[in-house]
């Protein structure tokens, strides 16, 4: 088995074991024990061992989940770190209790970052237990080793990371007991009961565990080796990640496209006709556009073509995690991580189904109960008042497009829940998920589209309009947006206006003509919405809906990747109008400049992610994947050379504020003041100098710029220690060749009161 090659992980983990029979009837055993006479206790010792109470141990990922499971199982007795009752022990992991050990664990010399130590490629992987979670690990280890525990149920999150969390603890505890897997998509009591009635053999998920383990090891190898390599070569800490760096490359590339973009002006002639307007083609020659406008002004336009089509717009599919994060960012302004956190809370509160899903459909066994759920959700949502609700279950049922988990939907518990008591963020996400369910099963949006072509002065002009036949799902969407204080308009609203009845050959008077000037626009800065979309397709602009997706990261990991890019200083969130843009820092651009293709290529990294999926499906051996990662790193360390001219690339450019009064060199702002950049010159204006501190003022760039240019600067809000009041005055620079001194001039500019 593959598991036998995992160093400290026992190969017995991967041995498939037969399921156990259900536990004996507890009351019957208690009654049988009660008829034994006291004198027979010693004689019955052997029999007692055989009839000892047996338990099944359930290990969840979080205490809150364990509590919900225990309530359904009847494990009501609280113990230290677990719950007990009805033949069950229920405990929890507190997330990642253990993880891959750091480099220094393998060799103390690795504590210091040195080029000669690279690449660091462990032969036998080691794991360490988080210090702040040691107590809970000890509880789990004791439970896993108890003789009365006959079977272990893995109830950690039903996904790649949940599998890794459980298996790591199981193996570190030295456990070899049979594993059963709880795999559910909802925390509703009914879903929990059904899940425990259909526990699966743990061996069914060996591939999932191997994929999770390979992902963790690959991230460790790339992070440790590439980060150390580039940090040592470029003399500053540069965090590099297997998925993080290609994601950053997408953003840097977009910024380069924006910077290189040169807008091209264009001109469009617009004619006002009775009841509507038409537009001509874009023209690059302004004079020609003016000439056409003059020719059309006061003239007649002839209708050349009228084309009417009945069209239908299908409802949007249900949410997977990524599409929900995108909409929540665009409509609500939430980051991907905020949306995931809110959705996780709703899942644990039994109000939404499993969050980390990549499917947008439901399974056929859910079809029968769907109309009831839709009605419950509709009644709980205030924005749908007055709108008829229907349920086309067939539109959202697609068994082949559901793998581990179905789409995110509300649960029936929404009926009893007090939604007003939910935190604002959770309520907003629940409403968005509810809206999508109601829209997805609603009728299509039907409309008649009219396209008209008119001729005037030998040029063609066009217009489009539409008449709504059935608002369908768009009525719900419009009602939801109307309930929000501010929300983007629906797509297509610009063409919702109907055109008047027109006939080919009809002549229309031109009431007015105008030339509208525009410019071609650059690509847009990434937002979390558009970046998540790019990560799904590894930067490809288009991808067929049915294509095998090879994206950057997974729905479960993308939010964390974005947050790390921000926390490490590579990305900045900058608000622009109603959107928050993601902009790369100076260091981000510098890093992508020096990174080789194999570390920044989105397509190559997406291929790695695809191979992890192959490991999960049993189509690729884990060691083949890992050997590819190791070979890449060996080549990288052995062949990479510092790019000439980039030695100082990671020193942020200093903004020059003026010329030095002593040597004529450049004076630039730094953290503690303004300094001459000529190393032989000592001119400095310190931000925290005693003179400025007494005035309770700090020299700004504007003040220093004026002092260097004119020798004086008008400063407001200076503090008087004598009167305790503030005043305005002119500060004069008085440099004696050793120190930059200052004095006040109250006579140069009137009006500043002392």
Roles of regions detected by a PLM:
Residues 48, 53-57, 79, 133, ...:
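Basic, low-complexity terminal or inter-domain segments flanking catalytic cores
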Residues 63-70, 87-94, 130-141, 146, ...:
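Amphipathic alpha-helical transducer elements in NTP-driven molecular machines
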Residues 42-216, 220, 484, 522:
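Intrinsically disordered, low-complexity regulatory segments
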Residues 286-319, 325:
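Metal- or metallocofactor-binding catalytic centers and their adjacent structured scaffolds
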Residues 189-273, 308-312:
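C-terminal or mid-to-C-terminal helical accessory/interaction module adjacent to the motor/catalytic core
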Residues 2-12, 17-19, 25-29, 33, ...:
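N-terminal amphipathic/hydrophobic targeting modules at extreme N-termini
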Residues 54-57, 155-158, 235-237, 308-317, ...:
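Conserved short loop/turn motifs at secondary-structure junctions
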């Amino acid at each position: 088995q593959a598991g036998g090659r995992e160093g400290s992980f026992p190969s017995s983990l991967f041995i498939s074991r037969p399921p156990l029979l259900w536990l004996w009837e507890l009351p019957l055993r208690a009654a049988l024990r009660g008829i034994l006479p006291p004198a027979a206790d010693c004689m019955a010792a052997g029999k007692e061992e055989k009839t000892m109470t047996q338990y099944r141990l359930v290990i969840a990922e979080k205490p809150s989940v364990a509590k919900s499971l225990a309530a359904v199982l009847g494990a009501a007795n609280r113990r230290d770190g677990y719950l007990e009752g009805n033949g069950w022990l229920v405990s929890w992991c507190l997330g990642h209790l253990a993880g891959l050990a750091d480099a220094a664990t393998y060799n103390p010399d690795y504590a210091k970052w040195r080029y000669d130590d690279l690449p660091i490629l462990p032969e036998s992987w080691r794991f360490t237990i988080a210090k702040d979670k040691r107590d809970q690990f000890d509880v789990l280890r004791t439970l896993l080793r108890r003789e009365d525990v006959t079977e272990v149920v893995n109830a950690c999150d039903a996904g790649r990371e949940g599998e890794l969390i459980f298996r790591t603890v199981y193996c570190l505890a030295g456990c070899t007991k049979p594993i059963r897997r709880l795999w559910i998509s909802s925390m509703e009591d009914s879903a929990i009961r059904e899940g425990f009635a259909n526990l699966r053999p743990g061996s069914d998920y060996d591939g999932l565990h191997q994929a999770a383990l390979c992902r963790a090891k690959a991230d460790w190898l790339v992070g440790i080796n590439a980060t150390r390599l580039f940090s040592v070569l470029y003399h500053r800490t540069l965090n590099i990640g297997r998925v993080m760096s290609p994601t950053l490359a997408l953003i840097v590339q977009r910024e380069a496209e924006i910077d290189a973009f040169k807008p091209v002006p264009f001109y469009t002639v617009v004619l006002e006709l009775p009841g509507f307007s038409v537009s001509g083609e874009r023209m690059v020659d302004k004079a020609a556009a003016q000439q056409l406008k003059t020719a059309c002004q006061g003239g007649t336009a002839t209708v050349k073509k009228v084309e009417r089509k009945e069209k239908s717009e299908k409802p949007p599919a249900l949410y997977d995690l990524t599409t929900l994060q995108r909409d929540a960012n665009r409509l609500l302004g939430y980051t991907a991580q905020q949306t995931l956190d809110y959705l996780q809370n709703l899942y644990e509160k039994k109000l939404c189904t499993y969050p980390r899903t990549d499917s947008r459909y439901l399974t056929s066994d859910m079809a029968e109960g769907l109309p009831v759920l839709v009605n419950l959700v509709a009644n709980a949502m205030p924005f749908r008042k007055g709108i008829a609700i229907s349920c086309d279950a067939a539109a959202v049922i697609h068994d082949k497009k559901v793998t581990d988990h179905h789409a995110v939907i509300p649960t029936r518990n929404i009926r009893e829940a007090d939604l007003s008591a939910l935190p604002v963020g959770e309520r907003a996400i629940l409403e968005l998920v509810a809206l999508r369910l109601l829209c997805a099963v609603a009728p299509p949006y039907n409309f008649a589209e009219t396209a008209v072509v008119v001729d005037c002065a030998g040029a063609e002009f066009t217009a489009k309009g539409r008449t709504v036949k059935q608002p369908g799902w768009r009525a719900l969407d419009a009602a939801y947006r109307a309930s929000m204080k501010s929300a983007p308009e629906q797509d297509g609203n610009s063409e919702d206006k109907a055109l008047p009845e027109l006939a080919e050959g009809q002549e229309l008077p031109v009431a007015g003509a105008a030339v509208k000037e525009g410019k071609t626009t650059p690509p847009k800065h990434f937002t979390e919405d558009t970046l998540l979309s790019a990560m799904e397709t590894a930067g490809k602009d288009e991808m067929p809906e049915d294509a095998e997706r090879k994206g950057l990261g997974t729905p479960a990991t993308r939010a964390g990747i974005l947050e790390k890019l921000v926390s490490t200083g590579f990305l900045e969130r900058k608000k622009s109008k109603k959107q928050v843009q993601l902009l790369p820092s100076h260091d981000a651009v510098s890093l992508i400049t020096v990174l080789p293709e194999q570390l920044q290529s989105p397509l190559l990294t997406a291929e790695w992610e695809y191979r992890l999926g192959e490991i999960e499906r049993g189509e690729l051996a884990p060691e083949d994947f890992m050997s590819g990662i190791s070979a890449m790193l060996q080549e990288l360390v052995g062949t990479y050379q510092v790019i000439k001219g980039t030695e100082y690339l990671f020193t942020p450019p200093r903004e020059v504020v003026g010329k030095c009064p002593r040597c004529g060199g450049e004076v630039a702002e730094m953290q503690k003041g303004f300094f001459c950049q000529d190393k032989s010159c000592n001119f400095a204006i310190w931000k925290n100098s005693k003179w400025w501190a007494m005035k309770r003022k700090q020299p700004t760039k504007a003040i220093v710029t004026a002092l260097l240019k004119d020798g004086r600067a008008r400063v407001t809000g200076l503090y008087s220690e004598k009167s305790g009041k503030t005043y305005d005055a002119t500060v004069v620079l008085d440099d004696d060749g050793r120190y930059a001194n200052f004095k006040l001039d109250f006579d140069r500019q009137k009006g500043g009161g002392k």
